[in-house]
Amino acid sequence: AFSGILAEADIAAALKACEAADSFNYKAFFAKKAFFVIDQDKSGFIEEDELKLFLQVFSAGARALTDAETKAFLK
Protein backbone atom coordinates (compact mmCIF):
# COMPACT_ATOMS: atom_id res chain seq x y z
CA ALA A 1 0.00 0.00 0.00
CA PHE A 2 2.93 2.35 0.63
CA SER A 3 4.99 1.18 -2.33
CA GLY A 4 6.79 4.16 -3.77
CA ILE A 5 5.98 6.34 -0.75
CA LEU A 6 8.09 4.74 1.99
CA ALA A 7 11.11 2.45 1.76
CA GLU A 8 10.67 -1.10 3.06
CA ALA A 9 13.51 -0.51 5.54
CA ASP A 10 11.73 2.57 6.93
CA ILE A 11 8.49 0.62 7.31
CA ALA A 12 10.30 -2.24 9.07
CA ALA A 13 12.11 0.16 11.42
CA ALA A 14 8.90 2.01 12.28
CA LEU A 15 7.04 -1.23 13.04
CA LYS A 16 9.97 -2.49 15.15
CA ALA A 17 9.92 0.73 17.18
CA CYS A 18 6.33 0.15 18.26
CA GLU A 19 6.11 -3.63 18.70
CA ALA A 20 5.24 -3.42 22.39
CA ALA A 21 1.69 -2.56 23.40
CA ASP A 22 1.17 1.15 24.19
CA SER A 23 4.48 2.10 22.54
CA PHE A 24 2.97 3.54 19.35
CA ASN A 25 3.72 7.27 18.96
CA TYR A 26 1.55 8.60 16.14
CA LYS A 27 3.40 11.93 16.00
CA ALA A 28 6.62 10.15 15.10
CA PHE A 29 4.94 7.69 12.74
CA PHE A 30 2.23 9.60 10.90
CA ALA A 31 2.72 11.36 7.56
CA LYS A 32 0.18 13.34 5.56
CA LYS A 33 0.39 10.97 2.60
CA ALA A 34 -0.44 8.10 4.93
CA PHE A 35 -3.92 9.54 5.49
CA PHE A 36 -5.07 8.50 2.05
CA VAL A 37 -3.86 4.94 2.55
CA ILE A 38 -5.31 4.60 6.06
CA ASP A 39 -8.69 5.92 4.92
CA GLN A 40 -9.54 2.50 3.51
CA ASP A 41 -13.16 3.32 2.67
CA LYS A 42 -12.12 6.62 1.02
CA SER A 43 -14.71 8.52 3.07
CA GLY A 44 -12.39 11.46 3.72
CA PHE A 45 -12.32 10.51 7.40
CA ILE A 46 -10.33 7.96 9.33
CA GLU A 47 -12.66 5.98 11.55
CA GLU A 48 -11.62 4.34 14.82
CA ASP A 49 -11.70 0.86 13.25
CA GLU A 50 -9.36 2.04 10.50
CA LEU A 51 -6.98 3.43 13.14
CA LYS A 52 -6.93 0.18 15.11
CA LEU A 53 -5.61 -1.58 12.01
CA PHE A 54 -3.20 1.23 11.09
CA LEU A 55 -0.03 -0.85 11.48
CA GLN A 56 -1.50 -3.56 9.25
CA VAL A 57 -1.55 -1.07 6.37
CA PHE A 58 2.24 -1.37 6.45
CA SER A 59 2.42 -5.12 7.03
CA ALA A 60 -0.46 -7.62 7.14
CA GLY A 61 1.15 -9.42 10.10
CA ALA A 62 1.45 -6.33 12.30
CA ARG A 63 -0.55 -6.09 15.51
CA ALA A 64 -3.69 -4.02 15.96
CA LEU A 65 -3.34 -0.89 18.08
CA THR A 66 -4.59 -1.05 21.64
CA ASP A 67 -7.62 1.01 22.66
CA ALA A 68 -5.29 3.44 24.48
CA GLU A 69 -3.10 3.88 21.38
CA THR A 70 -6.17 4.38 19.19
CA LYS A 71 -7.61 7.00 21.56
CA ALA A 72 -4.24 8.83 21.67
CA PHE A 73 -4.18 8.82 17.88
CA LEU A 74 -7.63 10.45 17.84
CA LYS A 75 -6.49 13.37 20.03
UniProtKB/Swiss-Prot annotation:
Keywords assigned = Acetylation, Allergen, Calcium, Metal-binding, Muscle protein
Query: What's this chain's function?
Result: In muscle, parvalbumin is thought to be involved in relaxation after contraction. It binds two calcium ions.
InterPro entries referenced in this protein's UniProt entry, alphabetically: EF-hand-dom_pair, EF_Hand_1_Ca_BS, EF_hand_dom, Parvalbumin
Q: What else is known?
A: Is regarded as an important allergen.
Q: Which GO terms describe its molecular function?
A: calcium ion binding
Annotated family: Belongs to the parvalbumin family.
Q: Which residues bind Ca(2+)?
A: 39, 41, 43, 45, 47, 50
What this protein is called in its record is Parvalbumin beta 3
Give residue numbers for the modification (N-acetylalanine).
1
* Gene3D superfamilies for the chain: EF-hand (1.10.238.10)
Q: Where is the EF-hand domain?
A: 26-61
A single Gene Ontology CC annotation of this entry is:
cytoplasm
Annotated source species: Merluccius gayi
